[in-house]
From Swiss-Prot:
The lineage of its organism: Eukaryota, Viridiplantae, Streptophyta, Embryophyta, Tracheophyta. It comes from Arabidopsis thaliana. GO terms for biological process: DNA damage response; negative regulation of cell population proliferation; negative regulation of DNA-templated transcription; response to auxin; response to ethylene; response to jasmonic acid; response to salicylic acid. Component of a DREAM-like complex which modulates a variety of developmentally regulated genes and of the mitotic genes in proliferating and differentiated cells. Associates with RBR1 in both earlier and later stages of leaves development. Interacts with CDKA-1 and E2FC, but not with E2FB, at later stages of leaves development. Residues 1-83, 239-261, 380-458, 474-505 are annotated as: Disordered. Induction: Slightly induced by ethylene, auxin (IAA), jasmonic acid (JA) and salicylic acid (SA). One of its GO terms (molecular function) is transcription cis-regulatory region binding. It is found in: Nucleus. Keywords: DNA-binding, Nucleus, Repeat, Repressor, Transcription, Transcription regulation. Residues 73-124, 125-180, 181-231 form the HTH myb-type domain. GO terms for cellular component: DRM complex. Pfam families: Myb_DNA-bind_6 (PF13921), Myb_DNA-binding (PF00249). This is Transcription factor MYB3R-3. PROSITE patterns: HTH_MYB.
Amino acid sequence: MSSTFNPAASSPDEEETGEVKIEDQCVENKQSTPASCSSVSEGSAGSSHKSPTIASPATVSPTHRYLGRTSGPIRRAKGGWTPEEDETLRQAVDTFKGKSWKNIAKSFPDRTEVQCLHRWQKVLNPDLIKGPWTHEEDEKIVELVEKYGPAKWSIIAQSLPGRIGKQCRERWHNHLNPDINKDAWTTEEEVALMNAHRSHGNKWAEIAKVLPGRTDNAIKNHWNSSLKKKSEFYLLTGRLPPPTTTRNGVPDSVTKRSSSAQKRVFGSVAQTSSVTTDVNNLAEDGNGQINSSVPVEEVVAASRMTSLNEYARSPQLPNPEPLPENGGAANNGYHLYYTPQIDYYRASEVDTQRMYGNECGCSPSASPVSFFTPPPCRNVHSNGSTPRSPESYLREAGRTYPNTPSIFRKRRPRVVVQDNNNAKKTDEAKEVDQKVNDGKDSSEIQNNGSNAYNLSPPYRIRSKRTAVFKSRQLEFISREEEKADDETKSSEKDMLIDGDSQLLG
């Protein structure tokens, strides 16, 4: 005995009942393409719109009686379709012109005619369109739903080439239905979804009855993407975790962490400035003693602090002003730019002496650990800050790059310290230099007298340079060697005179 199901002549409730009966006989397809079972009334490949007959236990072929089933589905698929089965199905459809699905199913011992029909309609049919929906297709579905109602999907699919009834039905219920609520989920809806999921599990159609305006597909997506992670917290406390509010696209948690970090940094900068100010006040009093309880190492380390992170980004002076609430963006559109504050920086003597040498008031004979206070400027603004030149900003920025030569650093002048043991030799060298300098011009002597230890002497004639070089060599010649040289020179002169007299005679 067989029964048929005509969707065109049945009511929506009867069609849904028929779909449930047909879907009980379907098998889940494991292919990547959608192959879930739906109503057989969704437009088959043939011209007839009647569903194929459903075999009863009395019409089971003898080859399948070994299953021993007397009720319910007759055959179940043992797995996904193999490439060999797909090729066999194509050949059978070509043989029977896609009309007799009972004869087509005879080619598969473990497949029913419904499974073969769905495999062909949803996967193998070359005329099937699986791509995204176009605007024209959506308008056509809306027009046909107004004409036929949201039930006769097989008739609606006939007006959309390449689409089947199941695709049209899912497109309407998930996207095109004007009753769909597409607003953001409220807390009440999420709590209702939590409670319904505890009762029904993953039965999204049952849960959708509790949430009017939400489709089962939207409910499933929201559960898997958001609420599934909050379910443990809800089961423990009975309420949802507090939502993470955002401020201009930045979560409050990130804003709080950044503000706390800024407070710590600015607090350390303020503490550094206060310690440095105390030390400078002691230096201005003229006392060489430092009676501060702060360790000297900490003060030195704090005085060298010029940026929040010297090695992670470009150098900048610390800014005690808080950042604006819009995530650090200024009113003029620039990001992460702060006006440098001068009052929070004090250079130490070690750094200043390395840059400027001993010309800024730093004495080499001072204590090993001392501090330098820059000389006060006469021009003072109304707010108490002193004007600065661009070179000072460049010098401070250059200090943040260690082991790098700087164009602003000056050479240290060499200081020659005389030793008492070499005083005698130095006096002799001075006497020789005095004899050599007798033939020099007065202007040259005056220039040399102003800078006695200049490493770059003025230009001299070659003969004078040779004389100076010889005079420097005399420092290492003793009196006896000088006498021996004089005797040798006199004997050479006598020999030359005798030789000349013989040639003339």
